Amino acid sequence: MQRKIKSYVLRAGRISNRQQQGLDLWLEDYELKFDSPTPWNFAKEFGRHDADTIVEIGFGMGTSLFAMAMNNPQCNYLGIEVHKAGVGSLVADLHEHQISNVRVVVHDAVEVLQTKIPENSLAGVQIFFPDPWHKKRHHKRRLIQSEFIQMLVKKIRPSGFIHCATDWEDYAEHILNVLSSESALFNQQKEGGYSPRPDSRPLTKFEQRGERLGHGVWDLVFIKNKEVTNDKACNSY
């Protein structure tokens, strides 16, 4: 998969003292380096052999990723983010609460998936509130496209999941069409539409405010090769 168009724009934003402290003092404790010569071995990187690994792409300020890691210590979480403020915020939280089941990579998600993630190695991938690029001329920048999903399918194991959430209805329809068109995926919602928000996905302050204002949020959960059973605790779908 050759993707030259980026789904994000790096802007010079303000970084708080706490976020900078996270980057300067504790990032090295959690970071997986993209420039390592071989794909990652998750048993080695997380220091345990019996845990499933879930990837979150674009974790923002890390609120959901932090909560899920704290609530599911039996699971490994790998967060991918390019914006330094969010990385610093998450790392500071991880350090403060001594959370050990999270690793972070500060790099483009497509390149990470292409070169660093072994095939059939993930219990799931979650993408919460990706940039909707709402103007029609920018739709080509949307992260979730057919080629991208085809790559994800190769990285998750049979019975693994892809969980997306968006507050932009047009993007939700696009994501539903893309996921439904992938023959290796099955919609967790039997009626073929959107899923209720799973308990496993924390409700963010942003969502709570949106709900009060009447804004919608659409969750989509698809499973790879649904007929393959899986008793691993990290796949609650």
UniProtKB/Swiss-Prot annotation:
Substrate binds at residues 135, 167, 204-207. Pfam families: Methyltransf_4. S-adenosyl-L-methionine binds at residues 56, 81, 108, 131. The active site is at 131. It catalyses: guanosine(46) in tRNA + S-adenosyl-L-methionine = N(7)-methylguanosine(46) in tRNA + S-adenosyl-L-homocysteine. GO terms for molecular function: tRNA (guanine(46)-N7)-methyltransferase activity. The keyword tRNA processing applies. One of its GO terms (cellular component) is tRNA methyltransferase complex. Its EC number is 2.1.1.33. Keywords: Methyltransferase, S-adenosyl-L-methionine, Transferase, tRNA processing. Pathway: tRNA modification; N(7)-methylguanine-tRNA biosynthesis. It comes from the Bacteria. HAMAP family: tRNA_methyltr_TrmB. Catalyzes the formation of N(7)-methylguanine at position 46 (m7G46) in tRNA. Belongs to the class I-like SAM-binding methyltransferase superfamily. TrmB family. NCBIfam families: tRNA (guanosine(46)-N7)-methyltransferase TrmB (TIGR00091). This is tRNA (guanine-N(7)-)-methyltransferase. The lineage of its organism: Bacteria, Pseudomonadati, Pseudomonadota, Gammaproteobacteria, Legionellales.
